[in-house]
UniProtKB/Swiss-Prot annotation:
Disulfide bonds join 158-200, 192-233, 291-342. This is Cysteine protease XCP1. CDD domains: Peptidase_C1A. Glycans are attached at residue 180. Keywords: Autocatalytic cleavage, Cell membrane, Disulfide bond, Glycoprotein, Hydrolase, Membrane, Protease, Signal, Thiol protease, Vacuole, Zymogen. It is an enzyme of class 3 (hydrolase). The gene is XCP1. One of its GO terms (cellular component) is nucleus. GO terms for molecular function: cysteine-type peptidase activity. It comes from Arabidopsis thaliana. Pfam families: Inhibitor_I29, Peptidase_C1.
Length: 355
C-alpha cells in the first residue's frame, strides 16, 4: 500500500528543520536500494532524518532556512510519488537520488538538452547501413564487458547530453578498432562544435560526428577536461594526440532489428524522450514506463539482452554513476511500436573507423 505524507505547517517545518540541522547531520547511513522505508513516510522525525542524511550523501547545502524548507517539501512530494509508483509497477523500481529536491519542471530544464529545432534534418538512406544484411546475431551483447565503455560521466546542469552520447560512441568504436579505451573530451564539442550545435543549450550527435571528421579528431578528456559549462574553444592544441573516426552512418529509422544489428557490432548514439517523471528517479530493473517520442535527451546504447522474458537495450546515461543502475538503464525493446520505447529507434547513429 502507499502511505500518506506527514502533515506539517510551514512554521512547524521551519522549527523542525532548524533543529534537525543540528541533530541529524551525522545520520548518514546505508539505505535499501530505493533509499527509504515505510517508516519514513509516516513519521515526521524519521522523514527529517532521511532528508538530512540524503543531503549529506549528496553534498547538498541551501542558502537559507526558507530555501531548505522549500526543498524539503519538494523532497517529500517526490518521495510520495516514488512510493506510489513502486506500488504500481513491477518490472522496474524508483528510488531517491540526487534529483530528489528538484521539481519535475526544474529537472527537465537542467538535465535534458537535445536540439529540437534540428529534428527535420535529412537522415542518410538505409542503403548506407553497413549491418543491413547481418542475420546471425548473438542473444545478448554488453560492450561494458568487452572493455569498450568508459566510466559513466556527469554532464551536470549543462544541456550537453548530445556531446556525451557522441563521445561514448566514438570511445567505443575506437576501442573496438585499436584495442585502446580512451576517455575523450565532451568539452571540446561544447566549446568548438558551434556551427550547428549549441553547447549547453543542446545539439545533435550527427553534427558532432561531422565536426570530429572535419577537424581531424577529438582530444582526450585529460587534455581537454569537462567544465560543466561552455568555455572558449581550444581546438588547436599542438603535439596532443587526437582520436579519429572515418565517418558515421544512421541506423534505419523506426527499426528495432536494425538497432540491434548495429549494437551487436558497436555502441550506438541514440536519442530518447527522458522527460517522464519515472525516468528522473529510475533506480533499476527493465524500464517500460510511460514516455512519448518527443526526443529530448541524447544517450548511448551499449548492448542488449533479456531478463525474465523481457528484452531490453542497455543505455549509458550522463547523469553520474549514482543514477539508475550505476549510471545505466535497461530499456524494454520489442514493444510492438516501430519507434521503440521513448523513441529510441527514431534517431540512432554510429561512427565508423578503419583500422
Amino acid at each position: 500500500m502507499a502511505f500518506s505524507a506527514p502533515s506539517l505547517s510551514k512554521f512547524s517545518l521551519l522549527v523542525a528543520i532548524s533543529a534537525s540541522a543540528l541533530l541529524c547531520c551525522a545520520f548518514a547511513r546505508d539505505f535499501s536500494i530505493v533509499g527509504y522505508t515505510p517508516e519514513h513516510l509516516t513519521n515526521t522525525d524519521k522523514l527529517l532524518e532521511l532528508f538530512e542524511s540524503w543531503m549529506s550523501e549528496h553534498s547538498k547545502a541551501y542558502k537559507s532556512v526558507e530555501e531548505k524548507v522549500h526543498r524539503f517539501e519538494v523532497f517529500r512530494e517526490n518521495l510520495m510519488h516514488i512510493d506510489q509508483r513502486n506500488n504500481e509497477i513491477n518490472s522496474y523500481w524508483l528510488g531517491l537520488n540526487e534529483f530528489a529536491d528538484l521539481t519535475h519542471e526544474e529537472f527537465k530544464g537542467r538535465y535534458l538538452g537535445l536540439a529540437k529545432p534540428q529534428f527535420s534534418r535529412k537522415r542518410q538512406p538505409s542503403a548506407n547501413f553497413r549491418y543491413r544484411d547481418i542475420t546471425d546475431l548473438p542473444k545478448s551483447v554488453d560492450w561494458r564487458k568487452k572493455g569498450a565503455v568508459a566510466p559513466v560521466k556527469d554532464q551536470g546542469q549543462c544541456g550537453s547530453c548530445w556531446a556525451f552520447s557522441t563521445v561514448a560512441a566514438v570511445e567505443g568504436i575506437n576501442q573496438i578498432t585499436t584495442g585502446n579505451l580512451s576517455s575523450l573530451s565532451e568539452q571540446e564539442l561544447i566549446d568548438c562544435d558551434t556551427t550547428f550545435n549549441s553547447g549547453c543549450n543542446g545539439g545533435l550527435m550527427d553534427y558532432a560526428f561531422q565536426y570530429i571528421i572535419s577537424t581531424g579528431g577529438l582530444h582526450k578528456e585529460d587534455d581537454y577536461p569537462y567544465l560543466m559549462e561552455e568555455g572558449i574553444c581550444q581546438e588547436q592544441k599542438e603535439d596532443v594526440e587526437r582520436v579519429t573516426i572515418s565517418g558515421y552512418e544512421d541506423v534505419p529509422e523506426n527499426d528495432d532489428e536494425s538497432l540491434v544489428k548495429a549494437l551487436a557490432h558497436q555502441p550506438v548514439s541514440v536519442a530518447i524522450e527522458a522527460s517522464g517523471r519515472d525516468f528522473q528517479f529510475y533506480k533499476g530493473g527493465v524500464f517500460n514506463g510511460k514516455c512519448g517520442t518527443d526526443l529530448d535527451h541524447g544517450v548511448a546504447a551499449v548492448g542488449y539482452g533479456s531478463s525474465k522474458g523481457s528484452d531490453y537495450v542497455i543505455v549509458k546515461n550522463s547523469w553520474g554513476p549514482r543514477w539508475g543502475e550505476k549510471g545505466f538503464i535497461r530499456m524494454k525493446r520489442n514493444t510492438g511500436k516501430p519507434e521503440g520505447l521513448c523513441g529510441i529507434n527514431k534517431m540512432a547513429s554510429y561512427p565508423t573507423k578503419t583500422k
